[in-house]
Amino acid sequence: TPDKFATKTIHYIKIPMENYQEEIYTYFENIEEKKEKLRLKMFRGKIGDSISTYSAYTRQSCNFVFPNISDKINGELRPRPTITGLKDNEINTIIEGKNLTKQNTLIKTNKDVLEYIKQTKIFINTFILHLKNILKNDINYSIIDDVKNFRTNYNSSFTEFYNSTDQKSNLFNEMYKCSPKFIRIIFNIFKTKGTVMIYSNYVNMEGLQLLKVYMNFFGFIDLNDDQELNKTNLDIKTNLSKDGFRFCEFHGAIDKTVRKINKEIFNKSENKYGKFCKVIMISPAGAEGINLSNVRQVHILEPYWNEVRIEQVIGRALRFCQHQDLPLEERKVDIFRYKMVRLNNKPTADVKIEGIARKKNNLLLSFIDAVKEAAIDCELFKAHNMMGSKYTCFQFNEESLFEKPIGCAYQSKLENDQKIDNGLNAKDSNILHIRVRKIKGVLLINDHTYSSENYYWFNDNTGIIYDYELDYPIGQVFKNDD
């Protein structure tokens, strides 16, 4: 119910790739195809994934590609972990930034890991410097003017704004070229006055790390970098320069103490409109065991192989009574799910993974619905359960005779039905022996149709007819005085 759970609206956002992004994407797509062919050749179709990329290159390219800054810094030369002696899960720890302690251990013990981290920092710092140089030249029209135009003249419709012939800053064009997805997320954030949750499968590079770079250029700042804000004594009445423009993180690459403080500040009732912390960013590790309050927007940066994970992430922002600080009319959550598409309709990694996840999820849902429909308490909780999905509780086709219920279907004991029908299941019931006699007769099925002749038991005192084999009351004989 709305007073307990916020209502949700899911928006599936298809974003066409820019020409440069598609060029880099195709480059990595060809690399993945060659690696996959080599893997199949080496293992002859057997299980083996030692060189499989799991579409990591193209998945990351759907989020962001580095611009062509120099011969050494460009999209095609994006650093990749060529790490020897590490297991797949350890490589993923580095790529996705899952565990701070384990990541630091790998950096200290493996020189390849250290070199990879070093190269990624060079790329990111060079990219930031590249954007700053562009920003310096946007003297008369900046990216802040783009946001004002978007909010004032286009009723916060990004498609209309982007397709318009209005002037746009050079910084906007460059950032959009590298990541239309990041730009769409940030512009959607400006559409809500409440707090926002952003989820990505990646923490480093094309995940949250570069998204933070984008947000910095739009005026956002890390909660822990704001020297004006006193985190131990938050005052709703005090206005600071970065109010409504702070973000925080909650994932395995953040210290536990910092994570705890970030979550507490974000969930404060005084922060329901994002005054102290507007955006919280989480990863797969952060999605487990965290409940967020008063969230108005959820942004799913990319699809995942398993739809259950995405549903769990969305569930972090849609918990029981977690929007009670907001007025009833504001207890609404917009879910944005992004995927990149090509203009030639050739599927991208986002499209492929979403398709696989939906197929698996449809199979799972069909099984879950069957369990719900057959559940003993289906009718009891039907009104609440059907708020999420519609289904029909299992019922026997035949109507119970004399409007009496049927015995427990999960036990194949005829006695259960008989006890319910004859009243023996009652607390103070008694067994009364009656005298019946065997008769032959037919049943009236409708006004003009009768059954074939069968034997029945007949009680002369009550006129009740009983089934010959089951002793089950099936009808009653009435005498017509006419």
Model-identified regions with their sequence ranges:
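Helicase-associated low-complexity regulatory tails and linkers flanking the ATPase motor
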Residues: 1-279, 284-482
